[in-house]
Amino acid sequence: MAASDTERDGLAPEKTSPDRDKKKEQSDVSVSPRASKHHYSRSRSRSRERKRKSDNEGRKHRSRSRSKEARRHESKDKSSKKHKSEEHNDKEHSSDKGRERLNSSENGEDRHKRKERKSSRGRSHSRSRSRERRHRSRSRERKKSRSRSRERKKSRSRSRERKKSRSRSRERKRRIRSRSRSRSRHRHRTRSRSRTRSRSRDRKKRIEKPRRFSRSLSRTPSPPPFRGRNTAMDAQEALARRLERAKKLQEQREKEMVEKQKQQEIAAAAATGGSVLNVAALLASGTQVTPQIAMAAQMAALQAKALAETGIAVPSYYNPAAVNPMKFAEQEKKKRKMLWQGKKEGDKSQSAEIWEKLNFGNKDQNVKFRKLMGIKSEDEAGCSSVDEESYKTLKQQEEVFRNLDAQYEMARSQTHTQRGMGLGFTSSMRGMDAV
């Protein structure tokens, strides 16, 4: 709109003809110069007001959704149009000046000088306005760039502050955990649980408050605060749960033990009172008697009989249905007799006699062997009568031991002292048989 107004003002002088100029000169002669001057200034002020209004309307009607690049292009186009219109006006005014100099009188020349001054003022005003607009647009762009750089700096500083606050909160959490662990070791479990829970909650609140304050500075929506697990508290809670479970299991076991004892007492009472009477009592009470209950009652009666006769009871780890209590009692009696019966003095087996009379061909070896075997009397072993078979075996043993000693000595001399090859299986070993 502003460009169209400038073009109208520029094209207006083209329409003016020389006849019109002459009429103006005549009117100027008749009318005083002051009145004409005021009239011309009023028309100029009205045209300026119209231009301003049109500019304002154009600005209002522009869509806000246009991009910055489009606005820059428009400002450049407007400035180029203004320059063209100003050049066109300069050319027209120069042509008008030439005509007016040829055709005008002295009064006309004065008037044209005034017009030229006014036109030059208008041109200077339009140029200064375009410069001001350019300057304003540049200053706006600079301000925008400065504000963007400030926002970036602020965002960077905020991110640094967040990182610092997070690291501080982590360090505090670690300190809190270490303190809670050291306290929970020395204090009672029940007291430490309640105190550590209240303290941990208070510390969490204290930690969360500075976080919220630091994060509220940022325009972005703040995420929920991180609530990490307190390992010390978790361990204490797990320990408490385990203790509760152990208590429950212990109570169940105690109940089961009590029930078993009651059943055993009932079985013992049934055994003493007689199985037939017990079954009769159960039938009289109205309970259903199964064959298993009847068998258990019979076995209990047998065990009671055996206990009364022998004084030996069948242990609980045996199945009462599979073990006969009377036979078990007899076996136990025999075992006890064998264990606690004293040894008879004349009973010695042949193998015992052979070991006692063993001779290695060396007294020291014989003494060592008897000590190891627990043989006490040497004189009795020598004086006792020996059978022919035992004597032969003793002789054979002596010969075997002598041969072994000779072979060992030969092998030792060849391997260690003479340094023979291997174990000494050479022609010198043939002399071993003669020894």
From Swiss-Prot:
It comes from the Eukaryota. Residues 35-51, 112-214 have a biased composition (Basic residues). The modification Phosphoserine is found at residues 4, 17, 30, 32, 104, 377. Residues 230-270 form a coiled coil. The keyword Coiled coil applies. Residues 1-230 are annotated as: Disordered. The modification Phosphothreonine is found at residues 6, 16. Keywords: Acetylation, Coiled coil, Isopeptide bond, Phosphoprotein, Ubl conjugation. There is a cross-link at residue 376 (Glycyl lysine isopeptide (Lys-Gly) (interchain with G-Cter in SUMO1)). The keyword Phosphoprotein applies. Residues 1-27, 66-111 have a biased composition (Basic and acidic residues). The modification N-acetylalanine is found at residue 2. There is a cross-link at residue 376 (Glycyl lysine isopeptide (Lys-Gly) (interchain with G-Cter in SUMO2)). PANTHER family: ARGININE_SERINE-RICH COILED-COIL PROTEIN 2. Belongs to the RSRC2 family. This is Arginine/serine-rich coiled-coil protein 2. It comes from Pongo abelii (Sumatran orangutan). The lineage of its organism: Eukaryota, Metazoa, Chordata, Craniata, Vertebrata. The gene is RSRC2.
